[in-house]
């Protein structure tokens, strides 16, 4: 059968495999590429190259494939620490995840940890692949494991009863044996992902937001703020709000400029200069955002899920304690904040991944799922994500 020409007109969805070590995440990833993409062997995926995201080195493998209705970008990480870092830095944003669980073992510590992390960093949907079912003779055992997985997902606020659980053997699918638990299970899995994980709203369809990178004044014209539009669209003549650091204030965009050309509008992904009415040179600064009025609020207190770098990764050499005061780098600027550790935690070691509360000295335009780096004098010592806004 001739492969259909690769068309970019299908909606795009980012997903990834998560789950306990050795439960078959990488084998499953390879098996999916065999039936839906350009086949990538296990060792091509396992020898993932290192990348840097927010000053942190992460090994991640990227594969792409497509179903009849969608194009998928899929991430798989070789090691557990890579998963933690990947999910927290958002290096590979996931619109949904495939949770791989070995039918013989059932949920294990990292299964739990990845589900919790998924909840904290805002992975909205999960589909389960129960792997290695050929290693379990008793069908009742498989049912028990399925119940256990559903209960575990429900305990972390995922809809455990509704989540599709596909049973199969990724290895059989790779080797082209035992079609029912091999190839058929992979096809059933992708069908479930197609149906259960919704297509995310495209960046241009979301409310406008642009982090301010630089500000300058043009004599006779006014103040221009430059940056890369994170999401949405801005049109000349629209009202915008300046949020963060100081009290919010409104302005009107009187011009959009890109590569020295005047445009009617700018959209997500564009690097633009926005001409602002009635704002003087000191009225706006790097670290603030321009956004659709009322769409984002400034906050100073939040709960974070964070990963603290090891010494080998260029992080701290020593632990930190309660009332630690580093800088939190949001989008384009550092803001000092104080860390409040959870009860029962005395100190945090380099290499730890934990949840704590932060109070910033100045407000930042903040939403849940916003990523940040933790820095000391310009050096990255950790990465985090806003898991909950407190005030």
From Swiss-Prot:
Its EC number is 3.6.5.3. This is Elongation factor Tu. GO terms for cellular component: cytoplasm. Mg(2+) binds at residue 26. Pfam families: GTP_EFTU (PF00009), GTP_EFTU_D2 (PF03144), GTP_EFTU_D3 (PF03143). InterPro entries: EF-Tu_GTP-bd, EF-Tu_GTPase, EFTu-like_2, EFTU_2, G_TR_CS, P-loop_NTPase, Small_GTP-bd, T_Tr_GTP-bd_dom. GO terms for molecular function: GTP binding; GTPase activity; guanosine tetraphosphate binding; translation elongation factor activity. GTP binds at residues 19-26, 76-80, 131-134. GTP hydrolase that promotes the GTP-dependent binding of aminoacyl-tRNA to the A-site of ribosomes during protein biosynthesis. Belongs to the TRAFAC class translation factor GTPase superfamily. Classic translation factor GTPase family. EF-Tu/EF-1A subfamily.
